[in-house]
Amino acid sequence: ADRLHNMRTLSSMLPSKQYKIVGETLYIFAPLADRLGLNRIKTELEDLSFKYEHPDDYQLMLDNLKRSEMERDDAINDFTPAIREALDRMGVDYELKARIKSPYSIWQKMQRKNIPFEEVYEILAIRIIFRPRDRQQEIDECYRIYAALTQIYKPDPSPPALLCHETL
């Protein structure tokens, strides 16, 4: 919590102090937050570090995300009705959540793959959070939902990501 507060108030510190804190945050505290399952904190620490370490690139990511916002909204509006219809038909108690990749994460992918913003395709993800009817049958219900969704959208044949999730 102290580190997050320090990062949120970093602008009031001397640049030499900022540089030291940003380095520690990006290489020690953000990975630690990730290991502890504190994803929101990890993401905020990374983005704040990115903002101070690479201010021009950070601003460029924000500008690109703003510029592509309408396109993402259209994709959500086009993509989700069929999912809602299938889940409603199955009687699933669910919630759909859109997740936008963070500026730092987008920039990292661009650096790693040497690609422009327009070629980063995983900027938007839709999550289905459902409440299982019966805890004993939760895995079976996951497979039923998966089966229903693969009737609408064909699975991506690429191997699962490092976090062991698959995409449709």
Regions picked out by a protein language model, each given a short descriptive name:
Residues 3-168:
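Nucleic-acid processing machinery
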